[in-house]
Each structure stands twice: as C-alpha cells, then as structure tokens.
Amino acid sequence: MSRVGKMPVTLPQGVDVAIKDDQINVKGALGALALTQNALVTIKNDAGKLTFAPANDSREANAMSGTMRQLVNNMVTGVTKGFEKKLSLIGVGYKAQAQGAKLNLTVGYSHPVIMDMPAGITVATPTPTEVVIKGSDRQRVGQIAAEVRAVRPPEPYKGKGIRYADEKITIKETKKK
C-alpha cells in the first residue's frame, strides 16, 4: 500500500466532509471545495479521521490511494488555513497594482497587462514589486501564479521578469569575443 495513502487525514474542528456517490465535499471557514472520487479508492470516515484504501490489489489503485489522500488533505488545509503564492517583479519600472478582482501589471510592454482573478482567488500587492495570490484551492492558486509569471518570465542574462519569491534564477554569462 502507498506510504502516503496509509496515513489518515485528521479533520480539524469546524471542517465538514460529506461523501456522496462519487463526490467528496469539504466545507470549512474559508469556503467549500468538491472533488470527484476515483473508483479505485475506497474512503471511510471514522470519527474525524478519513482513511483511504485501494479498492483492489492493482498497482494503479495503490498509487491512486496516495494521490486521493493528498488531494483531500490539500482541500482540508485549504478550507482551514488557505494557500498563498508570492511573486516578485524584478526590473526597472516593473510594478503591479491590485484593483479589486483585477491585477494590473506594468512589465516593460507598450501597454499594461490586466488580468482578471477568478472567484475564490484574492490578489494583494504589499509593495509595487510584490504580488501575493491567496485562495482555498491549491491547484487554482498555483495555476493563477503560473499564469501571472508567464506574462514576463525571468530572462537568463539579467534576471529581469516575474518570478516566485523563493525561485532561484541562474544567470548566464554573456558571449565573449
């Protein structure tokens, strides 16, 4: 059995999990999330602990039990604490402004780039060169952060662009004659 799948998911106070048919619904202080249950995994709710087991002895079911356990664990963490990604803008004149549910980026193009944030995702700019993306769904927070970074990815010679706060960019040396 998968090592990750063996560990139960402990449900904190104030988190409700409902398993109906093939749908898993998690409700908490920061919202509600839903996930479709895989047929290869059986889930049991035992007094505040969710246990995951493969439905059969196949290798795929074993792997999927660990995957489902981690997805549900991320949902529980998301509705209690939430997730956030920090991005930093490096470059002369590069700045960001949060305008409600929109993010306005000035990153060296002839026009500002305006990005709409989907429901459930909040964006903040503590300083003009920092962007903080928060939400309860880990996958969506990471996806939106990747889309913001893709507007102007860091270039390898000077390192200018939008990067994750903890990302290390290796700077290349310029060509010598």
Curated annotation (Swiss-Prot):
Alphabetical list of InterPro entries matching this protein: Ribosomal_uL6-like, Ribosomal_uL6-like_a/b-dom_sf, Ribosomal_uL6_a/b-dom, Ribosomal_uL6_bac-type, Ribosomal_uL6_CS
Keywords, sorted A to Z: Ribonucleoprotein, Ribosomal protein, RNA-binding, rRNA-binding
One GO term (biological process): cytoplasmic translation
Keyword Transcription regulation: no
Record flagged with keyword Ligase: no
Entry superkingdom: Bacteria
A Gene Ontology molecular function term of the record: structural constituent of ribosome
GO cellular component: cytosolic large ribosomal subunit
Family designation: Belongs to the universal ribosomal protein uL6 family.
The protein's role, per its UniProt record: This protein binds to the 23S rRNA, and is important in its secondary structure. It is located near the subunit interface in the base of the L7/L12 stalk, and near the tRNA binding site of the peptidyltransferase center.
Subunit-structure text: Part of the 50S ribosomal subunit.
Protein name: Large ribosomal subunit protein uL6
Species assigned in the record: Polaromonas sp. (strain JS666 / ATCC BAA-500)
